[in-house]
Amino acid sequence: MPWSPLAALSWALVLRLLALLWPPGRGEACSCAPAHPQQHVCHSALVIRAKISSEKVVPASEDPADTQKMIRYEIKQIKMFKGFEKAKDIQYVYTPFDSSLCGVKLETNSQKQYLLTGQILSDGKVFIHLCNYIEPWEDLSLVQRESLNHHYHQNCGCQITTCYAVPCTISAPDECLWTDWLLERKLYGYQAQHYVCMKHVDGICSWYRGHLHLRKEYVDIVQP
């Protein structure tokens, strides 16, 4: 299931929609709903590891009256984790030019590799923005790297609920509580880096790190 209706639109329409969501006068900030890395993988049409070769500012559409711009990143795809049925070798990814429209700034012509998650638009172009999970590969934990191959997308039937304050509880057996913000005051803390929400044969979901069950302090959060 795609992250949003953006996947069904052309890239020019996506940019116009973002412009409506963040009009001039609202400020320069890009606002995104919190999502665990597992949710990002599940909700993205494409997940790849890549290096950025170059960038170029291009028009958002062929309409001469359209003044919107996009950044086209030329990439070298290293590995694809998701999206095999929709794309093969990705050469370019596109993002809004303005950071206020959630445009992504990536390093070009360096040895840095990135994990890129994004959507494949109706015209076949790959669209990324700041609300996707985009991280330098070297910053990912071993558990995150391994989970990209199997565990994340094999457990998309689990729901991850962000916990902001105690008490917080689950409302269904297929939910996992994400407590990084509560315990560490940051989203991508220890739990996001080292745990996967996995479904048991009985349909119950819970956090696992490899073969180890969730540490007790995370479980205790649900108690009033």
From Swiss-Prot:
Family annotation (SMART domains): NTR
Gene3D superfamilies: 2.40.50.120, Tissue inhibitor of metalloproteinase-1. Chain B, domain 1
Pfam families in UniProt: TIMP (PF00965)
GO cellular component terms given for this protein: extracellular matrix; extracellular space; sarcomere
Annotated localization: Secreted
UniProt main location, coarse: secreted
Signal sequence coordinates: 1-29
Family in the record: Belongs to the protease inhibitor I35 (TIMP) family.
Gene source species: Rattus norvegicus (Rat)
Disulphide bridges, residue numbers: C30-C102, C32-C131, C42-C156, C158-C205, C163-C168, C176-C197
Keyword Signal: yes
Site (Involved in metalloproteinase-binding): K69
Gene: Timp4
Record bears the keyword Secreted: yes
Amino acids binding Zn(2+): C30
Protein task: Complexes with metalloproteinases (such as collagenases) and irreversibly inactivates them by binding to their catalytic zinc cofactor.
Chain residue ranges for the region called Involved in metalloproteinase-binding: 30-33, 99-100
Name of this protein: Metalloproteinase inhibitor 4
Tissue: Expressed in retina, smooth muscle, skin, pancreas, skeletal muscle, heart, brain, lung, kidney and testis. Not found in cartilage, spleen and liver.
